[in-house]
């Protein structure tokens, strides 16, 4: 059998639909963010990155860079093994203590990515707890969906951000069910924020565990960057808080926080933790410094919110359709996969602006978008240039000026 023919047929379909993904080859440069060097031979040598998840530019912060450099000099490059076999470094334990403190929990546990932390934790909870039923928000991230699927626990989908529907679904479950309510704080593609207080109240009413993904909120919200749960004063009422080190903290890795028994349970049974090499100590050291900095500093968050507000106001003024939400994520709606790809290509090649088109399956068909994430290091001149480019392209590509 010619397997390549099978592969190529499905890739061909993706391309015809306009959903084939093309990666921009960039080279981040210390001290220059959001500018980056592009290795596209047909485009400009320098581009402005408008879609990074390094939301606060902490991956470029001098203290974070120095912490990683110092740790490499002291510890070398790799962890040397799994956490179970020679791979638990002092830097890992220090970072876990920093994370537990961030969320006001007894313990924390590190993973190699936010995807893995969700997948490993949810699959372990669902498979090991008796009569487990996981109630999942309809728009939960793929990592949560895959973890739930892998657990083989009973799954109940509740309407997105709808506590009343969650209440009905919980009430219909048998009394002996171990109920786990899984949801996010900030949803990455629409940028909406969950009605967390209402969800927590419903879960408590039915004796359910709460599993909260704060991936797009940690570092960004709350007086110390503890996320939306900290900002609302709800962290102590949530059973498990999951987050990432790869977005606002600018490094890489994922984690969970919770009670000591909960974290020990996941540590002891989660295959995604047990059977993989630990994060490099230098990564852990840099992440700890980034978290500690954002616990104290408000400057990055304040500047970032100011730039988000400025861009939203400018888009409103020129009628560029974008989703109205209270978060830092600005989805500009195109609603056509081919045009979305074309817009991104022209922005890159003609204007030196890099934004990745977001198409199916990341978002539903017909909701294709350009997802902008203004940061504290974007200048007012960067915003002016982006708005000028979007104004030009909306006319050139005949896209409607309408409310998203």
Task: Annotate each predicted stretch with a short phrase.
Residues 2-3, 12-75, 208:
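N-terminal "arm"/small-domain region of PLP-dependent enzymes with the aminotransferase-like
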Residues 224, 230-265:
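Active-site PLP attachment segment
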Residues 248-315, 320-323:
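PLP-dependent aminotransferase class I/II
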